[in-house]
């Protein structure tokens, strides 16, 4: 779950959840899909109770594993902006801006509460080796091109991607 907690944990914005589709060996940020929270069956009351009990305000992500029988096992909660959270912004919900306006200006801006459709996120170079191994070169290129959200690749600002590309070529 990726979200933002306001009003000491009493008001939660959780527009979606991510599911890792391919996990690289060297990180927990893999090729994933962000889906709308309305399609996810989870115990929202436990999440709400935890964040309101600790009185937390801010960005967060909550991670758990679901077994084959549907039982959830808590892994961790990150009380910070998650590395995968950019896909939520790509989907149209800018959680860091909501948090900024709440924390600095004392207001909750109007915002889109949920995402309309799933967004695929690819961590570009981190995923390349495992992605090509699993999908083949053309399969991975297809996933790269069709992913709506990337960790580095952005047509409006190619600098970080080109820098990292040069680093990998050397």
What are these model-predicted stretches?
Residues 2-55, 78-103:
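ATP-dependent carboxylate/phosphate-activation module, predominantly the ATP-grasp catalytic core
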Residues 2, 57-69:
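A short glycine-rich, hydrophobically flanked beta-strand micro-motif that places a catalytic Asp/Glu
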Residues 38, 45-48, 63, 76, ...:
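Glutamate identity and glutamate-enriched acidic tracts
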Residues 101-170:
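Peripheral (often C-terminal) accessory segments that flank ATP-dependent C-N-forming ligase machineries
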Residues 2-6, 62, 118-122:
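Broad, structure-driven detector of short, well-ordered beta-strand segments within folded domains
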Residues 65-128:
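Active-site/pore-lining binding-face segments in mid-to-C-terminal subdomains
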